[in-house]
Amino acid sequence: MLQRGMAPSFYESDYNRYYEESAFENPPLKDFAPDLIYLHTSWLNIACFPKLNAPTEEIAKLVQQEMNKLEIMLISLKTRYSCAIIINNFDLPSHRSLGNLDNLEGKTHFINALNTALIKLVKEHPSVYVQDLLYLSAQVGLSKWFDSNLYYRAKYAMSYEGLACVALNLSKLTCAIFGLSKKVLILDMDNTLYGGVVADDGLAGLVIGSESALAESYSAFQRYILELKERGVLLAICSKNTHENALLALSHENMLLKPSDFACIKANFEPKDRNIEQIAKELNLGLDSFVFVDDNPAERALVSAQLPSVAVLDIGQPEEYITRLDEAGYFEPISLSQEDLARVAQYQANAKRQNAQQQFSSYAAFLQSLEMRAVIAPFHPNIFERLAQLINKTNQFNCTTKRCTLAQVQEWAQSPTYITLYGQLVDKFGDNGIVAISVGRIEGEICHLEIWLMSCRVLKRDLEFAMLNSLAKRARELSIKTLKGYYYPTPKNAMVAQLYTNFGFTLQSQAESGSVFSLDLEKHTDKPHYIKVNDGTSTDF
């Protein structure tokens, strides 16, 4: 976690007191004020297994008893602390008294039923996440997962090897919850996506497909990359090749990755750190969003030295590529939204917009030509997950970089003391999805803007002005007279340092820790823009 920029402090409950400390008042934990709670359980904590040949109804009853116990803890923790919670599913014992029949009648069968029920339970509780202990135990191997000597002497539920595996996986999940997952995978080509060098070996000399073990390993790696792309990870190429040779390699009949799979292709002989900086500029993303994969250690060393915020992975040998990238956990997700599934198409549409802009002599004429339409409306349940995701991963156009849980998004939406707005922008090139959020806390005649953010994909389209106009209208309807905006500087959000000034706010106070701005709504007039706004009540969109 330290390597990913997190320096946590910990509260640890007494041994085997997880239920009591979760379900009842816990002053020490309340004073600690956790941002995240981890409930570590295993199959050893299962209170009661069904008897052999127990009827289906009895098994179902025991499953429900375990789920009721877990739900009591979850509800209590969510009510008292309003933070994210991680809970394990159940691993398997290292022994099977029924042998292979255990999967049909014994403990294995019951644990599988518990894990299925747990998935259903967690889906009913926002901001609760599952650590897949069942998978981790299989990854280590059950014979190595449980150390009977450690258990009987020290009550360790797993071996040291198992503990290390859990700790690493827990750090990946924690980083994902707090918005630290990466967004872009930058790939070299020669001897990374395929074997060989296209400029020297030609198309026929490239190693890819099923003709050899090496060829199969490269094909498998490309299939894995496509899986990442399909769930929203952006792909880019950074290769020392001519652009023509890069496209030639991607045209190979066994190549699974095609030019259309990449949000950006940089194939030239510039230093790779400069190309990566250019990719970041074109995609409007910070360098800390990138993972760089290259078989050449010299290129990896260059990028690590020049761009320390870029994650650089030692990818190993071709047969290790998938394992090393997967186990690094850079792209760990906590949810999947429609925006994730459409992300590559959205960035490709952005490229079309950039090309179209060159045809206009004035930027205003370009904006008018986009035929932009936006829904700017209060939060609603269908989009809670996307809103939490956007809040937790937006760093640059974000005035406060306040993070939240899914439960907090739900609370804001339902509270009469909050104004919530989201912005979804569409134009003639496509749907950008939900790309802007504002959250204001009402205090008398003042609305404090705790969150104001926007995706960098829609910079310079004036959506922020449309959002401000809608917010001001809603605030006036609630008899609010003053908006207060807050800017808390970070290494990444300098682009919004003057946002409230540009909105017409007056600077009230300024310190190293942040600035406070104020807007008198009685004097405020709407900002002009080129967006047709729907407040969510009209079907004309």
Predicted regions and their residues:
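Extracellular glycan-modifying ectodomains
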Residues: 1-186, 193-194, 199-200, 204-205, ...
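Terminal substrate-recognition subdomain of acyl/acetyltransferases
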Residues: 282, 304, 308-370, 473-541
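Substrate-recognition element of Asp-dependent hydrolases with the DxDx(T/V) motif
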Residues: 220-251, 266, 399-404, 408-409, ...
